[in-house]
Amino acid sequence: MRFLPCIATLAATASALAIGDHVRSDDQYVLELAPGQTKVVTEAEKWALRAEGKRFFDITERASSLELASNKKQKLAVTYPDSVQHNETVQNLIKSLDKKNFETVLQPFSEFHNRYYKSDNGKKSSEWLQGKIQEIISASGAKGVTVEPFKHSFPQSSLIAKIPGKSDKTIVLGAHQDSINLDSPSEGRAPGADDDGSGVVTILEAFRVLLTDEKVAAGEAPNTVEFHFYAGEEGGLLGSQDIFEQYSQKSRDVKAMLQQDMTGYTKGTTDAGKPESIGIITDNVDENLTKFLKVIVDAYCTIPTVDSKCGYGCSDHASATKYGYPAAFAFESAFGDDSPYIHSADDTIETVNFDHVLQHGRLTLGFAYELAFADSL
């Protein structure tokens, strides 16, 4: 993932034809570059845009619709707590976060040649990750907790791990599992250690620790919690679009979604003489949920936040936003200080600062627990 503000310039020159007017041949893709602004490109042109740092929704499979998802009716705003309510419990849970687990999972996960969503590697890496999630569930002894693949039109499946609560009100924690080498998308080496292996291990470890809480494991939390591992993010938020479109169609009651995309690179920040921080994205997010996210960081992390912007369609939280669900996004730094190695063979585990990943794990765990037990959402 890399997001640049110049997408606005591109969007201004893009065709604003209604989606229903597009006719797609086998090698053409419909991209949404900004709300209501679309462009038809070849696959080569699509990846060229990504290599330039442009971000977009690939809405090719939604091109028969006369209405963009971004124009759908927005859901009612959610009111979040203005302070943490479960500090003692969460602080005790935080002690169980194990930094070694990040590396134990990330090492083999980044050893797949790539995790390209259209490839056999993408399929196998998703199956491998599903196995790891199932191991955590089995070891926890929690009843009713599941992990299921969410199938798409491409080989890689998204994964949804669900911890049922007393209601269908749902809290979503997300990260994307695919990786890409933009010099050779289908065949190039793409370890994807930071982008977004770091986000995957962040929410996976939070999932493990959350299940050690007796009330959570017994299904006694007021709200349901889901952990999403999205496929096809690099191709235009493909997996998360499919999921949140379905959730919208089924009137799923998602009260909050937090995305973790790149949580491990700090050298850009420290080399610039800035304090290590958690980046809080402020565009294309829910303002109230973002304020609550800062409350969580203040309470449960030991480093500060820094506000930043990432542009349109920069990660999977944008899919939640598009379908009317409140979403927030925590990032490894301010935009511009993030890893320069992503989308290449150099995005390796050696570039990941696991102490920083641990900070994101703390905020993920706090966010999940506080909202799981928020009975006024």
From Swiss-Prot:
Zn(2+) 2 binds at residues 195, 234, 343. The keyword Transferase does not apply. It is an enzyme of class 3 (hydrolase). GO terms for biological process: proteolysis. Its main location: secreted. Calcium, magnesium and manganese cations reduce peptidase activity to 20.3-51.3 percent. The metal ion chelating reagent EDTA almost completely inhibits activity. The protease inhibitor bacitracin and the aminopeptidase B inhibitor bestatin, as well as DTT and beta-mercaptoethanol act also as lap A inhibitorsD. Belongs to the peptidase M28 family. M28E subfamily. PANTHER family: AMINOPEPTIDASE YDR415C-RELATED (PTHR12147:SF56), METALLOPEPTIDASE M28 FAMILY MEMBER (PTHR12147). This is Leucine aminopeptidase A. It comes from Aspergillus oryzae (strain ATCC 42149 / RIB 40) (Yellow koji mold).
